[in-house]
C-alpha cells in the first residue's frame, strides 16, 4: 500500500495548534518539527489501512470508562484502556496513544495510531503502526488534528467517515494518570475539541 503524508484538514489543525500553544506554553512545541522527522524515519503504515474497519458507528473508550457499548469498531484511547477492555473480553480494533500510559497495551489492539510530538519523540519505537504528528508530516506520517489522545481518537473516527460516534468514559473531572495543572488544561482542551467534532457528526456520551 502506497504511503504518503497527509494533513486531513489544514485549517482545523492550525486552529487546534493555536489554541494548544496559547493554553499550554509549557509544552515543547518547538520540538514538533524534530518529532515529525523522527516519525518519518520509523517506517509506519498508511492510515488507509484503517479503512478496512467499518467506521459507521465507532465506540471510543476513554481510560475512565465503565460501560460497554455496541458499535462497528472499538477504539481504545491509551494502552491502559486496551488492557482494561481486554479484561472485559473486548479486543480493541484501534488503539490511539502517545505511549505514556501503559504503552505495552498498544499491542493488544488489532492496529494502533501512535502520536509523535515534541515531548516524546526520542522514546517512540518502530512498530507496525500508523504514526501521527502535530506539525506538517513527512514520509509515512499523518496529521489528523486533535491534541490529546482522546480528542484525536474522535477526530480520527470523524475523518474515517463515522456517521455517529459513541464515547464511553469521557469525564474531564476524573484524572487517572496524574492530577496537575497541565493535565487539567489538556482535559479542558479535549472537551472543547470534542464539541467541535460534535458540530459535524452526532456524538453521544455514556
Please place each PLM-identified region on the residue numbering.
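Buried, small/hydrophobic-residue-enriched core segments of structured protein domains
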Residues: 137, 167-173, 184-186
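Pocket-edge structural micro-motifs
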Residues: 62-63, 133
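Short, glycine-/Ser/Thr-/acidic-enriched flexible segments
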Residues: 65-66, 81, 136, 172
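Acidic/Gly/His-enriched mid-domain segments of enzyme catalytic cores or analogous surface patches
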Residues: 73, 79-162
